[in-house]
Amino acid sequence: MNSIQLIIDIILILWLLILTVLYLRKKSLNLNIVKNKKIVRAKRYIVFYVIAESKVKSDDLERVVRNSLKDLLGNVWLNIANPKVVTYREDTQEGIISTNRIGYKAVLASLPFAKEINGNKILIVPRRTTGSLKKAKKLIGLK
């Protein structure tokens, strides 16, 4: 009886050892795969203008955009989209929000929820989404 149990134990140990080796080989092969950097870096630029009672500063605008995205979809989507106000012209109240390809729709959906800055009512109106910063700057009248 003990010899049968010993044989079964040895077979199970060998089986687990083989599975462990196969798993570690597969894991090491996956570590060498490089992600497609073009997909990771794909950015979208949202050209927008602001309708407000008074002038709005760029820092306040970025804070409100991030808070509206956080309120609408939570911290997970805030970290995924990572919206940043790249350029903002205070004279014409036009600007560009930079985000990635995955999260630009979430940023667009959250813009109407940005309703006030420092007690002043605002409305952020997206004009166009582009894939290049050069074209976005051209749309707001910069070089």
UniProtKB/Swiss-Prot annotation:
GO molecular function: ribonuclease P activity
Catalytic activity line of the entry: Endonucleolytic cleavage of RNA, removing 5'-extranucleotides from tRNA precursor
Role played: Part of ribonuclease P, a protein complex that generates mature tRNA molecules by cleaving their 5'-ends.
HAMAP family for the chain: RNase_P_2 (MF_00755)
A GO cellular component entry from the record: ribonuclease P complex
Pfam family, one: RNase_P_Rpp14
EC number(s) reported in the record: 3.1.26.5
Complex and partners: Consists of a catalytic RNA component and at least 4-5 protein subunits.
Signal peptide: none
Gene: rnp2
Protein's name according to its UniProt entry: Ribonuclease P protein component 2
Primary location group: cytoplasm
